[in-house]
Design a protein with these regions (language model features):
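N-terminal assembly/interaction segments in proteins that build large macromolecular machines
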Residues: 2-331
Length: 331
């Protein structure tokens, strides 16, 4: 049967599907709108299933607060073209609104909430079928209580943060939310860093310290032999620089011997106490750079101060209760 342009426009407005897909569905459904919508839904599911193994590195991240409940959610897709589309952003916003209205605490809860004519997960799958891109929900996190500030970095919908203070101070809360966006803290304070992370960072610090001390001894021996350490820092460089004439074959062999013998001798005589002290210093630096309250505050007007010092300058008892951060941007 013939399908009118008015019917095509109407169904397209209802579903967001492409004109060709809408026309085909209406034709197969013989003008029955409900049947045509079901055909479009089924085809969308099939298309989404075919794309399940694709990477979703773009998307839309939104944050919102209503009264004492705030949440961040991300709807991921494959391309920035789809991510920046009004329909995609609206779907993300609708899902976030539903999550906040229900005060959902987990992503699994969010996926079951009603959004339009379907639950959130089904709505995402339908949109995936329409666009032809894989889509998935991610990054859902919440804060609940008083004194919460939310921040969408540059309103680009790719990085959002939330901060909760123990006292009402909107300006301080907003600035700390910007700090969280800019400086990517891994924990609120040192006590909040997991034991696993502390152990890993200390092991890395010990290994790096040993490597640097051995390298320093080897480089000193190379320089004493008249060999530029930069020319022999890898076997590949030794071979290529010998071919270029920057090293003689004899120098190349001497460099290999120095790296092996001096390196082994230095590694065997390293002072464990000194290694541990240096590694502990590096771990302290890790805490300073990655714990929110200890980070250098980026939005002050005067002298350098930590985030904790900034808060104390606003109110002596002002503290951060919790924070959340989610981004799709490469960092």
């Amino acid at each position: 049967m013939a399908v009118s342009i008015e019917d095509i426009k109407k169904l397209r407005a209802m579903t967001g599907a492409g004109l060709a897909d809408v026309k085909k569905a209406l034709t197969e459904a013989e003008g029955d709108f409900d049947k045509a919508k079901e055909l479009l839904r089924e085809r969308g599911l099939a298309i989404a299933a075919k794309r399940s193994d694709r990477e979703t590195s773009n998307g839309c991240v939104l944050v919102k607060k209503v009264n004492d409940f705030a949440a961040i959610i991300a709807l991921k897709c494959e391309t920035d073209f789809v991510a920046n589309g009004a329909d995609f952003i609206k779907l993300t916003s609708d899902i976030l609104d539903a999550a906040i209205a229900a005060k959902a605490h987990t992503l699994d809860e969010v996926k079951t909430l009603k959004v339009g004519d379907a639950d959130a997960q089904a709505a995402v799958t339908q949109r995936s079928g329409i666009t032809g891109e894989k889509m998935e929900l991610d990054g859902y996190c919440v804060l609940e209580g008083d004194n919460i500030e939310v921040y969408d970095h540059m309103n680009k919908h790719t990085l959002c943060t939330m901060v909760q203070l123990n006292e009402n101070n909107e300006e301080a809360g907003h600035k700390v939310a910007m700090q969280v966006a800019a400086m990517r803290p891994v924990a609120l304070d040192e006590s909040s860093v997991s034991n696993e992370t502390k152990k890993t960072e200390l092991e890395v610090a010990v290994a790096k310290t040993k490597e640097e001390l051995v390298e320093k001894a080897v480089n000193a021996a190379l320089k004493k032999a008249g060999i530029n350490p930069a020319h022999v820092d890898s076997e590949e460089h030794i071979e290529s620089n010998t071919k270029k004439g920057w090293l003689t074959p004899e120098q190349a062999e001497e460099a290999r011997n120095i790296k092996k013998t001096v390196g082994e001798e230095k590694a065997a005589t390293l002072n464990p106490t000194m290694i541990q002290n240096i590694a502990n210093g590096r771990l302290a630096k890790f805490f300073k750079e990655n714990c929110l309250v200890d980070q250098e505050f980026q939005f002050g007007d005067g002298d350098k101060q930590t985030v904790a010092q900034y808060l104390a300058s606003q109110s002596k008892d002002l503290k951060i209760v919790a924070y959340q951060r989610f981004t799709l941007a490469a960092e």
